[in-house]
From Swiss-Prot:
Binds at least 14 chlorophylls (8 Chl-a and 6 Chl-b) and carotenoids such as lutein and neoxanthin. The keyword Acetylation applies. The lineage of its organism: Eukaryota, Viridiplantae, Streptophyta, Embryophyta, Tracheophyta. The N-terminus of the protein extends into the stroma where it is involved with adhesion of granal membranes and post-translational modifications; both are believed to mediate the distribution of excitation energy between photosystems I and II. The chain crosses the membrane at residues 102-122, 154-174, 222-242. Residues 1-36 form a transit peptide. Chlorophyll a 2 binds at H104. This is Chlorophyll a-b binding protein 8, chloroplastic. Its main location: plastid.
Amino acid sequence: MAASSMALSSPTLTGKPVETSANPSSQELGGARFTMRKSATTKKVASSGSPWYGPDRVKYLGPFSGESPSYLTGEFPGDYGWDTAGLSADPETFSKNRELEVIHSRWAMLGALGCVFPELLSRNGVKFGEAVWFKAGSQIFSEGGLDYLGNPSLVHAQSILAIWATQVILMGAVEGYRIAGGPLGEVVDPLYPGGSFDPLGLADDPEAFAELKVKELKNGRLAMFSMFGFFVQAIVTGKGPLENLADHLSDPVNNNAWSYATNFVPGK
């Protein structure tokens, strides 16, 4: 959407001729040269027939949604025309919130999988030191330490500081690479960097890529709600998500959100 070079409408600036170099991304003003990096988003527009973009896109209440705010035009994925709090009215704030939502969505999807998958394997005979997600970390303080996947030959962790430092270094390196645009500045959009982050080439087709952005946000929003539910379950029941699901299916009348909410006593 944004251009990669600057055009000057007048041949002079402050009375001095302006010479343009052969490189369209650099200019000379007097004796000084400056170079401009490609801006943050090179936009690939979805087809006008997409149900997820444009003025005729799917809205939050379908045909009963009413008129969307003027600043919600259907330009971005996940825009259902709903913003009663006006959080998207300021373009700069909206841009920051979009990035926060996408990043948190990705972490939530990974987190939800990490909460459910070990418990699922444990219930099917795979041995874990502790399969319940909010109890697993405490194993590092046990005498034997924490074995990843219950296998001491993989990662045998006995220092919480070492685990913390390793996560900061590895996660920080990847995030730094994404935000900085890669070592050569080849990443145009830090939200959807592509390149090494897309080894399968899922973003090669613009229309498919536009639809994948919507799917990512829809699943990410569900995952964020799921993680919130997992936290509440852990506090109220002291059990993992699959065990809570099994309890509900075995006795839905006594094992549900309402019964726990009306009988919950903090600290018990």
